[in-house]
Regions:
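Flexible, low-complexity linker/loop segments at domain and module junctions
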Residues: 1, 89-90, 283-289, 319-320, ...
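Short beta-strand-to-turn element immediately C-terminal to the catalytic PLP-Schiff-base lysine
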Residues: 10, 231-235, 281, 312, ...
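Condensing-enzyme catalytic core mediating Claisen C-C bond formation in acyl metabolism
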Residues: 1-2, 25-30, 206-283, 291-292, ...
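Glycine-/small-residue-rich "gating" segment that lines the acyl/pantetheine channel
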Residues: 116-123, 161-164, 168, 177, ...
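Active-site-proximal alpha-helical scaffold in enzymes
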Residues: 71-83, 135, 140-143, 148-184, ...
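Short pre-catalytic strand/loop immediately N-terminal to key active-site residues, enriched for Gly-Thr
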Residues: 122-127, 147-154, 216-220, 322-333, ...
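Conserved beta-ketoacyl condensing-enzyme motif
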Residues: 1, 18, 22-154, 183-192, ...
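Active-site-adjacent elements of ketosynthase-type condensing enzymes
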Residues: 36, 40-45, 102-106, 185-212, ...
């Protein structure tokens, strides 16, 4: 991995996102995008102070969906960070970039136009602008990369799937470099209402940054987030020859499904456990070689307990020696972007020798009894880190990243 780009609730670029996560600074606050005063939940982790004109033409800044615009910001940063311009033939650079929902806000806006102004006023760009693959296609147009390009969709595991599949494409020889990641921008009254109806969200009116409490006994739900993250992957030997900054390497990757419920985790954690075992096997690693897990850790009562159970099943006694943290305690849950953002957290953790904390962890839960790096970053060098991602529909993905000496 030679380039990182991010637009998140913690900052407008990858370095500021990482610094804030390590410092335990929260991106969770009262919703600004609309008046949420009539909702039982009024908080979210929004991308703040994003200026579309910095990443797109005035025309595109007006017509493209927010999820595409923040994707452009993350992608341009990652390409610049990797020094990728002119290195490879455009035909050999691919893009695997997904989203869970796509151009949701544009769909609602055009539905309002149809209802209020009639069918003749619906924008001709409406349909191309809201597809799940719009962002991956628009990134290719903006950057000129003509290699393999598609939009993996696995709900909240989308970003993880994109990163893992990108590595597989490069291994097969289908591309020399891949931009991989995900984005989501769906903080909207309808989405908020839907999650409120599911009773999945945390409500914290007095102090929003305390709402997301992964693995804490008082956790009461997740916090909606938004963001985009792109990681540039290349062949290790080629990156070394050209003198690129190498943050980390991908050692293994696996997917699975719970085959249990569309919205609830399997309490036995069979699918998640099998996924981690398979990733370790593919990487040729023993469980004892893993030093850090960036957990899916959404702060839901069922989800955090199930993930902890899976970690203990796979790692045995070593589970209690592992460091496990959830950066969703400060980013909220960025859905399709989450897996990519958290893969980036693992990359920086092994590269920088510091583990980001789980904030707001104050009350131990007997079902969640591991080392969750509570409330303060931990300077420690780990050689291998694992990023877990789980999504609605039972989709699971994990990526193993290793330090490059």
């Amino acid at each position: 991995m030679t380039g990182l780009g991010a637009v998140t609730p913690l900052g407008g670029d990858a370095p500021s996102t990482w610094r804030a996560a390590v410092a335990g600074e929260s991106g969770i606050d009262f919703i600004r995008a609309f008046d949420a005063s009539e909702f039982p939940v009024r908080i979210a982790a929004e991308v703040k102070d994003f200026d579309p004109s910095q990443v797109a033409s005035p025309k595109d800044a007006r017509r493209l969906d927010r999820n595409v615009l923040i994707s452009l910001g993350a992608a341009r940063e990652a390409v610049a960070d990797a020094g990728l311009d002119g290195v490879y033939s455009p035909d050999r650079v691919g893009i695997l970039f997904g989203t869970a929902i796509g151009g949701f806000i544009s769909i609602i806006e055009q539905a309002d136009v149809l209802r209020e102004r009639g069918p003749d006023r619906v924008a001709p760009t409406f349909l191309p602008n809201v597809l799940v693959d719009t962002a991956s296609g628009q990134l290719a147009i903006a950057l000129g990369f003509r290699g393999p390009n598609y939009a993996p969709v696995s709900a909240c595991a989308t970003g993880s799937t994109a990163v893992g599949e990108a590595a597989e494409l490069i291994k097969r020889g289908d591309a020399d470099a891949i931009l991989a990641g995900g984005a989501e921008a769906c903080i909207h009254p309808l989405v908020l209402a839907g999650f409120c109806s599911m009773r999945g969200l945390a409500a914290e009116d007095e102090h929003p940054p305390r709402a997301s409490r992964p693995f804490d006994a008082t956790r009461a739900g997740f916090v909606m987030g938004e963001g985009a993250c792109v990681l540039v992957l290349e062949e290790l030997e080629v990156a070394e020859r050209r003198g690129a900054t190498i943050y980390a390497e991908i050692l293994g990757y696996a997917m699975s499904n719970d085959a249990h419920h569309l919205a609830q985790p399997d309490p036995e954690s069979v699918g998640v456990g099998e996924m981690m075992r398979r990733a370790l096997e593919r990487a040729g690693l023993e469980p004892e070689q893993i030093g850090y897990i960036n957990a899916h850790g959404t702060s839901t009562p069922l989800g955090d307990a199930a993930e902890t159970r899976a970690i203990k099943q796979v790692f045995g006694d070593h589970a209690y020696k592992l460091a496990v943290s959830s950066t969703k305690s400060v980013t909220g849950h960025c859905f399709g972007a989450a897996g990519a953002i958290e893969a980036m957290m693992c990359v920086r953790a092994v590269h920088d020798g510091v583990l980001p904390p789980t904030m707001n962890y104050e009350h131990p839960d007997p079902e969640c009894d591991l080392d969750y790096v509570p409330n303060q970053a931990r300077p420690v060098q780990v050689d291998v880190a694992l990023s877990n991602a789980m999504g609605l529909g039972g989709h699971n993905g994990c990526v193993l990243v290793g330090r490059v000496p």
